[in-house]
Amino acid sequence: MAWLRLQPLTSAFLHFGLVTFVLFLNGLRAEAGDLRDVPSAGQNNESCSGSSDCKEGVILPIWYPENPSLGDKIARVIVYFVALIYMFLGVSIIADRFMASIEVITSQEREVTIKKPNGETSTTTIRVWNETVSNLTLMALGSSAPEILLSLIEVCGHGFIAGDLGPSTIVGSAAFNMFIIIGICVYVIPDGETRKIKHLRVFFVTAAWSVFAYIWLYMILAVFSPGVVQVWEGLLTLFFFPVCVLLAWVADKRLLFYKYMHKRYRTDKHRGIIIETEGEHPKGIEMDGKMMNSHFLDGNLIPLEGKEVDESRREMIRILKDLKQKHPEKDLDQLVEMANYYALSHQQKSRAFYRIQATRMMTGAGNILKKHAAEQAKKTASMSEVHTDEPEDFASKVFFDPCSYQCLENCGAVLLTVVRKGGDISKTMYVDYKTEDGSANAGADYEFTEGTVVLKPGETQKEFSVGIIDDDIFEEDEHFFVRLSNVRVEEEQLEEGMTPAILNSLPLPRAVLASPCVATVTILDDDHAGIFTFECDTIHVSESIGVMEVKVLRTSGARGTVIVPFRTVEGTAKGGGEDFEDTYGELEFKNDETVKTIRVKIVDEEEYERQENFFIALGEPKWMERGISALLLSPEVTDRKLTMEEEEAKRIAEMGKPVLGEHPKLEVIIEESYEFKSTVDKLIKKTNLALVVGTHSWRDQFMEAITVSAAGDEEEDESGEERLPSCFDYVMHFLTVFWKVLFACVPPTEYCHGWACFVVSILIIGMLTAIIGDLASHFGCTIGLKDSVTAVVFVAFGTSVPDTFASKAAALQDVYADASIGNVTGSNAVNVFLGIGLAWSVAAIYWAMQGQEFHVSAGTLAFSVTLFTIFAFVCLSVLLYRRRPHLGGELGGPRGCKLATTWLFVSLWLLYVLFATLEAYCYIKGF
């Protein structure tokens, strides 16, 4: 691993070794030019040797004098080289802002309605941007913006004449990405572990296009119109970009012929190459009121987007459960923060995130995730410490507490409580009350009452009574109302020296009636044994309730002792401790007792969505009366003839017998915990990486720019705690603080959904890229290097270093290999179609309007393209072979296989650079 951590440094030494070797050969050729064959007519000495005559740059002028002494030349080389490195750092930092804006843009969401298999619908949010489309468009543009813009600026800045720097940088960068980056990713995986590409169809499409892109370059340079790029060739090259994106999207969505490929396929077992399909076949989803992609598999309708949402929820629930088991002493807020950091660390991340993370860790800006976790912890702590004082309220609120009362018919009177809350309790307050008929009538069931409640200074509540009239008639429970009105406060008396004007300027104590200002009194008949019932026929409970309590009411009488049996009955929810604990027993209602409670334990399964039911059933009530009523209702008395007096007494006894009421069976529906569900939803929103990498204000950006933070590694710990910055962090921070402060002026990503930052960043990248192109050209001509060699050796390396670190982090942290190597092929294709296609289209159109042709030298570029294409076939073949069962995936595997693959890829890159350099200096015959 130590070699790996020094990989960029090692690669740099290899570069300098190659440069030294080339310069040495160039010197030998200059001294012994007579030993070589005379160049052909189409190949003069100037084209074979690096020109020492520097040309005017797009932005930078020529450094005069043009023929300096050896000492001045060395000084110029050092200045140009240091300036190149510093400009590469600047481009990396502004590209950090650029990629952050892309992450915010591609993270935009919209609401969709998803149909579940049971026909129900639910509303959720999905990303507007398809992952494959964003990777091939904005993500590829973000990671390859310097190469693409360099090609365009070089052509436009030099009078629409083709140059070697831009195209050679694109090809050289493609070689570095394909061989060095993939080689590093293969090696960094721990021994015995593997990573394989998940979206294999998309990888095949982008890999095919990346190889085709360079074959196409050779065709237009050496076959269709050698040395000339026609308008149609440039436009067609540019047009291949949307075609590539479209086909990759089709493969990702399984459209066209892909929709018939429902099953998993594998090749002949003797060959051993396993090709897997990812995910399930997309089903119906209703989006914006219309059904889209409604394909069916096995008769089930399960939307792909819905499945992805469910998977993310299940993963979040699993994380919360695991953390709760590991840290039972933590409260919910602490668990949420830990789960947030864990989910952010382990979720699949975009290419943009890894690029941003790599740049910030290189420049002393710290680990994004740990900084985010620390900020969230500080925010939570500060919120818990801040207590907002409620504004003083001069108005006293007067109301009933409670607002519902129950009493037996023989109670004599019922007491009602009036409460005042808030305001100045040192004042005397008055409030009137009056009874109103409901189903109970004044004079027959209760005594009409009205009056005034006086709350003296310091009193916050007061009681008053209403008389209840008793009778011996069986009747239903009845109710009446008591209403409050005309609340007022005793007026302030004028003190000595106080005028009415001064008194009016003071905040007067006020009083208002608050809800509930009407109380309901229910009179329970005491002449009947009672009707026993639940309050309703259905009740919804949260699975996190623990023990649910259900009331059984005794209405229309409460005379005597009654036993009511009860038991739980299974529905879709199962008893025996699986979903609830089986419960059964008897409730004993004593004389005048009107309410009993049944308790049932609910098992908390911590599910995001849950809806299961069971029932609680009441049995026939048993009257424990031992008087004449029980005797007349006994079977022995029923068999003999009764007298008229006994018949009347039996009829009255039958009327007073306890019975079941309207709701003898209660359905209990167990639902998900609303608190748990909201916690999961909140966590899913908080794990949006756009919130982590994005910025909300210029203040945040400037504070971040001047703050040095520790880099660290995700794999070091899972706590999310920040470490102290190292010496390297401080050095890199002070080296790059100028760029950080300068680029803090870029609009925050929150503005215009990231588009403002996107536009400003790409303009700055274009300007810096133009300067890099001039510096690289002047550096090359100062030491006698051709632009094509400078591009392959220096510029391609400088623009690819952040991608190297990003891919290494992605390979280690992601479960799949898509983010680390899957984007390499797509990025290589996009570089050609956008970088070269756009530049050559503009130049070809310009010269066509002038009535001339756009000339491009086919020699060096065609040779480099051909060489890269051959080596790319070898690289892709090896990656495909590594999917064999005994290796398991493109990355990692047994140590011996890892080393062999890595050395093969590094060797391919070294050979590419060597052959391209030798061809550029005519040691190898090109095309």
Curated annotation (Swiss-Prot):
Membrane topology, record value: Multi-pass membrane protein
Keyword Lyase: no
Extracellular face of the membrane: 31-73, 169, 224-230, 748-754, 800-828, 882-903
Annotated binding of Ca(2+) 1, by residue: E409, D445, D471, E475
Region described as Putative calmodulin-binding region: 253-272
SMART domains in alphabetical order: Calx_beta
Residue sites binding Ca(2+) 3 per the record: E409, D471, I473, E475, D525, D527
Domain characteristics, as noted in the entry: The cytoplasmic Calx-beta domains bind the regulatory Ca(2+). The first Calx-beta domain can bind up to four Ca(2+) ions. The second domain can bind another two Ca(2+) ions that are essential for calcium-regulated ion exchange.
Name of this protein: Sodium/calcium exchanger 3
